[in-house]
Amino acid sequence: MVGSESVYCGEQGRGGGDNVEAFRFPPGDAPLAACDCSRRVFCAGMLTGTLASAMSLGGCAARRNEAESSAVPAKQTSKRSSATKATAAPKSSWIAAIQQDIEALVESYGDSVSVYAVALDPQTFASFDGEVAVAPDARHAAASIIKLPILACALETVTAGELSLDEQITVTQQDIVGGSGNIQSRGAGVSYSIDELLHAMIAQSDNVAANLVIGRLGMDTVNETCAALGLTQTVLARLMMDTEAQAQGRENYTSARDAAAVLQRLAAGTIATPELCERARGYLLAQEDARGIVEGVPGGVLVAHKTGSLANAQHDAAIVYAERPYVLAILTQDLEREQALALERDISFAINARAHS
C-alpha cells in the first residue's frame, strides 16, 4: 500500500499538510533575472558562456530552510575500509589534495558518512584529474537521491524518441501520496507534462511526480539505465512513500559515487542531448532546499543539487560552479538531522575554499 498524506515518510524535503504552498512551475525557458535565494544572490551579469546557458532554464526558485519529518526505512550499508578511502585517480589536483582534511572531518562518524567529490574541467565539465573519496561505494538508503537516476532514465528515453517532454499524465486518486511536493494538494484529475513532472520531482522533490514518472518509464527501465551508467550500488525497488514495500524489506539504494556520476554526466552534457542536459541542470538549479552543501558555498556561486532525507538519512549531491567547478556527494545515516546538515556544510566549505584558492 502506498502511504497517504497522513503518513509523512519524508522522501526528502517538503511535506504536505500545513506546509503545502500554492503549486507552481517556473517556466523552463524563462530568462535569468537577479533573484534572492535565501541569503544568496545570483545575477545574470555574473555569468558568461556555459554557466549562463546552464542558468537559462528552470529559473532560480526561492530556497527555504524548512523542517522535515520521516518514517524509518530499512538500513543497509557497506563497512568502510582503508581500501574505500584510497582511489586510483591521480592525487595531483587541487581537490585530491584535501583528501586528508575530509577524512579528518568524518573520522568520528565511523560508517555513517560517505563522501565523493570530483573536479571538473572548467570548459567541458568532464571529470578532471582528481577526487576525494571516503567510503564512496558504501550503499545507503537513497531517499530522494534516487530521483537523480530516475531523471537520467527519463532524459535517455526522451533522447531515444520514446518519450516527449510535452506528454501529459493525469493524476488519479491512487497516485496521491504524502511527503515532499505540492502536487498532492491539487488532487486528482489534474494533468501535467513530463517536463513539469521532472521539474517538480527535482526542484520540489515531489513524490507524486516521481511515482508518475516511474510509472511511465517502468521500474525495470530505470534499473537498466542505472546498470548502463555503471551505477553499481544503485537500485530502484519501490515507489516513493510505499510503506508496505519498506515493511517487506524493499528499499531504494545508492552510493555517493553513483550520485556524483549522474551529476557529472549532466554537467558535461553527455547523459542525453546537450539541450536536455541543460534543461535538467535548470531543474537542479531550482532546488528549493538550501541546507547542507549550499550553506558551505559563498553567495554568487551556483549550486545545482538534489537533497534527500529519511528518518535516519540525510543526503546532498551537487554540481558546484565554483572558480574550479566540481561535483560533491555526501550521504549520511544514523545522525541527527542538524548534525548531518552541519557536517555537509563543513565538508562543502572545506572543498569550496580550495576551489577558489
Give the ranges of each region predicted by the language model.
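Active-site SXXK
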Residues: 139-169, 328
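Short, glycine/proline-biased beta-turn/loop segments that scaffold the active-site neighborhood
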Residues: 160-186
